[in-house]
Amino acid sequence: MSIDSLKDKLPDFAKDVRLNLSNIANDDTLGEQTKYGLMLACAVATRNAEVLKAFDQECTPHLAPAARDAALAAATIMAMNNVYYRFVHLASNKAYGTLPAKLRMNIIGNPGVPKTDFELWSLAVSAINGCGMCIDSHEKVLLNADTTQDTIQTAVRFAAIIQSTAVALEAASLPVSAAS
């Protein structure tokens, strides 16, 4: 399965998603590893097996094994961090922010790819998972590393499109309405 096969499965009510999916597939504003690692990390974050399989097939040929592992690690570590830090951020009791997290996250310090790639992937996954504290943290690191706001916006746009693809496929699995 590929991105093209996903597009073929999207119903007419998701025409915009289909067109946006074509746009990111053809987007060349990011480097190859950055782009394909980003798409794979976001696909994992959707928690949709069909989306993950299609993006894995599409992305893996463009990624060294270490880069593929780093993309998978970005989605995985953010699944943990986004829950924890979203809680810390949203809890009325601010004392939680003063407590040690006690979460192992060594992969962030040594991801096996350039730090800016891993940070960009982590930011995009954090956008999917809705953790403002993590978004701010990763954005700060990226901006300090001279990553442009356009690059950050592109990553979040990719995340939004990949997430909407998963939702559209789930919506398309509903039975056809009797009124149709």
From Swiss-Prot:
Reaction it catalyzes? N(6)-[(R)-dihydrolipoyl]-L-lysyl-[lipoyl-carrier protein] + a hydroperoxide = N(6)-[(R)-lipoyl]-L-lysyl-[lipoyl-carrier protein] + an alcohol + H2O
Source species, domain of life: Bacteria
| Alphabetized GO MF terms | alkyl hydroperoxide reductase activity; disulfide oxidoreductase activity; hydroperoxide reductase activity; peroxiredoxin activity
Q: Which terms does the UniProt entry file under GO BP?
A: cell redox homeostasis; response to oxidative stress
Instruction: Name the Pfam families on file.
Output: CMD (PF02627)
List the EC numbers from the record.
1.11.1.28
Disulfide-linked positions? C131-C134
What SUPFAM superfamilies does this protein's entry cite?
AhpD-like (SSF69118)
Keywords noted in UniProt: Antioxidant, Disulfide bond, Oxidoreductase, Peroxidase, Redox-active center
Identify which residues the record assigns to the active site: C131, C134
Which Gene3D superfamilies does the entry link to?
Answer: AhpD-like
The family database entries (InterPro entries) matched by this protein are listed as:
AhpD, AhpD-like, AhpD_core, CMD-like
- Identify which top EC class this enzyme belongs to: oxidoreductase
The entry assigns this protein to a family as follows:
Belongs to the AhpD family.
The task this protein performs is described as: Antioxidant protein with alkyl hydroperoxidase activity. Required for the reduction of the AhpC active site cysteine residues and for the regeneration of the AhpC enzyme activity.
Protein name (Swiss-Prot/TrEMBL)? Alkyl hydroperoxide reductase AhpD
The organism is: Beijerinckia indica subsp. indica (strain ATCC 9039 / DSM 1715 / NCIMB 8712)
Q: According to the entry, what is the taxonomic lineage of the organism?
A: Bacteria, Pseudomonadati, Pseudomonadota, Alphaproteobacteria, Hyphomicrobiales
